[in-house]
């Protein structure tokens, strides 16, 4: 008989590394900032996410067999200005999962390598107003063959992902609004078993993974020293099925989520090239997701690969 399970925080935490965790960077794929030519931003970040309630389908409930499910992450991240219109970004996290109750052991290990190309397709300045259009593309792939089918404690789902994003940014007197939308296409994955049940019995080790639509809006204040912003995310899978009552989750479940949060960055004038970042997010609505709180901190250094320290961002 299967034990009651909750849905894995991995998908909220780890796939949102495509967005949420990289929001700690001095520049990332969901903001209107570009690194200048030959500027390289590199650093480390740490994050923790946890929940003790989850949505089983649309029902918000608890699971005493797991208690609080926690995910900790330490990651290396960076971005490089190829020129003033093209930036390359990367991230690779180390994940550790755990549950405060029950007998299930968590996992730890390197998860996925993600690389983005961010292109400034159009920018128009008129007085104090600046309007920008961006096109972003990315790929992610597992860096090891980790266990996928042990939710909610797997460190990843093991799919290879392609991300296509369009983004608009408007700024006036250092106040800004940025809106973006992404399509995330996911490859099939293979399990360590030859049969599984979704809404019917499937005699195969291969699982079709639904694609995802991800939307992001952020608004706030930014200048050369400070960024302070409110962020809202919406994540909707294009298919999948609900967790059945008191049953184990499955990698291709439907996973929908809305979360809100705040994000900040500080670049001290006296510490040229240094960026300190922090963020907090709360999941406010979901389906087959943990009702998670998420906090993260980062330290980054901007250098000029031509040999100069610090530099200018667009």
Language-model regions, residue ranges each:
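Outer-membrane beta-barrel biogenesis signature
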Residues: 23-55, 123-130, 305-314
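Outer-membrane beta-barrel strand-turn architecture
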Residues: 36, 82-86, 121-127, 170-174, ...
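Residues that define the transmembrane beta-barrel architecture of outer-membrane proteins
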Residues: 38, 70-74, 108-113, 131, ...
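Residues on the lipid-exposed face of transmembrane beta-strands in outer-membrane beta-barrel proteins
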Residues: 44-46, 76-82, 90, 115-119, ...
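Transmembrane beta-strands of outer-membrane beta-barrel pores
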Residues: 46-52, 92-98, 121, 139-145, ...
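Surface-exposed strand-loop-strand hairpins of Gram-negative outer-membrane beta-barrel proteins
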Residues: 48-73, 152-154
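Outer membrane beta-barrel transmembrane domains
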Residues: 55-57, 62-64, 201-314
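Outer-membrane pore/translocation modules
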Residues: 103-207, 252
């Amino acid at each position: 008989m299967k034990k009651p399970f909750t849905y894995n925080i991995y998908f909220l935490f780890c796939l949102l590394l495509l967005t949420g965790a990289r929001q700690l960077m001095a520049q990332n794929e969901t903001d209107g900032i570009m690194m200048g030519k030959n500027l390289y931003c590199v650093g480390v970040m740490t994050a923790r996410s946890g929940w003790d309630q989850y949505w089983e389908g649309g029902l918000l409930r608890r699971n005493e067999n797991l208690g609080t499910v926690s995910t900790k992450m330490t990651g290396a991240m960076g971005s490089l200005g190829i020129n003033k219109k093209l930036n390359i970004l990367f991230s690779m996290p180390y994940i550790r999962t755990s549950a405060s109750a029950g007998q299930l052991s968590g996992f730890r290990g390197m998860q996925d390598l993600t690389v983005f190309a961010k292109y400034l397709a159009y920018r128009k300045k008129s007085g104090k107003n600046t309007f920008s259009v961006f096109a972003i593309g990315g790929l992610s792939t597992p860096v090891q063959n980790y266990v996928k089918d042990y939710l909610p404690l797997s460190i990843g789902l093991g799919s290879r992902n392609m991300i296509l994003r369009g983004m608009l940014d408007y700024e006036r007197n250092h106040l800004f609004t940025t809106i973006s939308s992404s399509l995330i296409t996911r490859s099939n994955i293979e399990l360590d078993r030859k049969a599984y049940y979704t809404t019917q019995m499937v005699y195969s080790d291969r699982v079709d993974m639904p694609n995802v639509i991800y939307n992001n809006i952020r608004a706030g204040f930014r200048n050369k020293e400070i960024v302070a912003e409110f962020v809202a995310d919406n994540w909707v899978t294009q298919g999948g099925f609900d967790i059945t009552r008191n049953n184990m989750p499955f990698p291709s479940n439907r996973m929908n989520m809305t979360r809100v949060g705040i994000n900040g960055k500080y670049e001290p004038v006296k510490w040229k090239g240094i960026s300190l970042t922090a963020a907090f997010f709360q999941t406010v609505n979901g389906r087959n997701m943990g009702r998670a709180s998420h906090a993260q901190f980062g330290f980054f250094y901007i250098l000029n690969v031509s040999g100069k320290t610090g530099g200018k961002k667009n």
